[in-house]
Design a protein with these regions (language model features):
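Phosphate/nucleotide-binding beta-alpha loop and adjacent structural elements of enzyme active sites
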Residues: 1-186
Length: 186
């Protein structure tokens, strides 16, 4: 989808300073970012769906409004219909990506993965992968179903008991967790 096209735009600006002002309207041109230290070695697009299992073929449902960009595995925007327009994407786990990309440490993981965030975080932490920061949007909380909220609360406690602190919660349902032993003043 559009994320791939946007990444291509960004790569054309690697090594460049920002030349435009940030608009805060949602879509930003690559020229608003300071990309002087960014290159293909430190910002790579991995064309797989992050998941808690490897090598699955998962349906990602198109948003009902074409201007919207986020595809979703839950299809909550179309009453969970299985017949909506979709694409098929192969999955990878964080473990697989870490191994393939030879990653030793994760400073920040940002997850806006439209319905897969809960099992992905469980698997990541159970596998003892502890990023310094976890920024996550819990999209399923938007549907206000009790079972979704309960799953979130269980995960929230799981994250806390794994040594994280909730550091920011200013735009529901976006959360920032920070690993306590990595930062001295929290």
């Amino acid at each position: 989808p559009r994320a791939i096209d946007y990444y291509e735009l960004i790569t054309n600006n690697f090594g460049s300073n920002s030349t435009k002002t940030y608009s805060d309207k949602g879509y930003e041109l690559p020229e608003v970012y300071d990309l002087r230290k960014v290159n293909l070695n430190n910002l790579k697009l991995i064309k797989y769906a992050l998941h808690h299992e490897d090598n699955l073929d998962i349906k990602f449902f198109a948003p009902p409004i074409e201007e919207h960009v986020s595809y979703s595995i839950t299809n909550f925007r179309s009453d969970y219909s299985e017949n909506s327009p979709h694409i098929i994407v192969k999955t990878k786990t964080i473990n697989s990506i870490i191994g393939e990309e030879d990653i030793n440490e994760i400073s920040l993981i940002k997850l806006d993965i439209e319905g897969a965030e809960i099992p992905v975080i469980y698997k990541m932490l159970k596998d003892k992968i502890y990023p310094y920061q976890i920024a996550v949007e819990f999209g399923d909380l938007m549907n206000k179903k009790f079972t979704k909220t309960l799953k979130f609360l269980k995960l929230f406690l799981f994250i806390i008991f794994r040594g994280y602190k909730l550091a920011n919660f200013d735009r529901y349902p976006n959360f920032l967790f920070i690993k306590k032993n990595k930062f001295y003043n929290i």
